[in-house]
Amino acid sequence: MRWPDLKGLMMTQIYERVALIGLGLIAGSMAHAMRRGGVVGEITGYARSAETRKTAAEIGLVDRVCDSAAEAVKGADLVVLCVPVGAMASVATEIGPHLKAGATVSDVGSVKRAVIDAVAPHIPENVHFIPAHPLAGTEKSGPTSGFAELFDNRWCLIVPVEGTDKTATERLKEFWADLGAKVDEMEADHHDLVLAVTSHAPHLIAYTMVGVADDLGRVTDSEVVNYSAAGFRDFTRIAASDPTMWRDVFLNNKEATLEILGRFTEELFALQRAIRTGDGDHLHDYFTRTRTIRQGIIEAGQDTDAADFGRVKK
């Protein structure tokens, strides 16, 4: 989609040129949100897949689709790595020599310590490296999946490394705020633990539950599809997320994810025991306590209490 020229109506321009490396859901949504707000001058982009580059060019996702990551970052004031965590090091190696002095390199990865370890060694001293993580997404992927509203009222966590320039950090915060996000800072290891609780372990549980249904010989595929209740449909939506991205997340956040899965297993055993022994009080008390988390999410504006059971509205 070609966006109109909004320069006469736009907010203060934060970066003259932004390069997006990787052109999937997050990068595409960033491009749409940048155009919506008019907060950048030019957007360049690169994706490893020639098919993705072709599609991105055809739909006008960015102003210029480049044939290499090195070409895309030349002259860019902000470079955002929107690739799976496992690909970060190789991309950083490629773009390092071509980065503009004074530029900022950031990312959108769901793991932060591994990204810092992979990327930081390849960033020149005259370039700012400021990791970030927008807590937004859908199960969709690819250059046509993005939309400008993805980050609206969602958190973007900025994870500065030691010695990060404060002015460059504030500039990146302003950029994400203008894309619609609420912005906060968090230390890398704490980020990885928090996300293991709120995102990584839940994804693994969803993959597992859908896998159990797929393996259960006594239940046919048609029954799983036709009689899926709201809870299972939520699992299938999560389990439809990009396999490469989530493989890399789990392999690069092992310690925190395994810690949370260990605690989950202990809780699950306790619930199994309560069911086996008929301990209804334990079950009721547990469900009452956990119910308050949902209400807290709604009150924080991160979801609504509107009924939505995945039915197509007529």
PLM segments and residue spans:
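Internal alpha-helical scaffold of NAD(P)-dependent oxidoreductase catalytic cores
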Residues: 150-237
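Rossmann-like NAD(P)-binding element
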Residues: 69-99, 103-106
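Interdomain hinge/lid region at the active-site interface
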Residues: 221-289
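Rossmann-like NAD(P)(H) cofactor-binding subdomain of soluble oxidoreductases
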Residues: 91-144
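NAD(P)+-binding Rossmann beta1-loop-alpha1 motif at the extreme N-terminus of oxidoreductases
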Residues: 11-75
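Residues at the starts of beta-strands that form the adenosine-phosphate
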Residues: 17, 42, 128, 155, ...
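Short, Lys/Arg-enriched N-terminal segments with co-localized hydrophobic residues
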Residues: 2-10
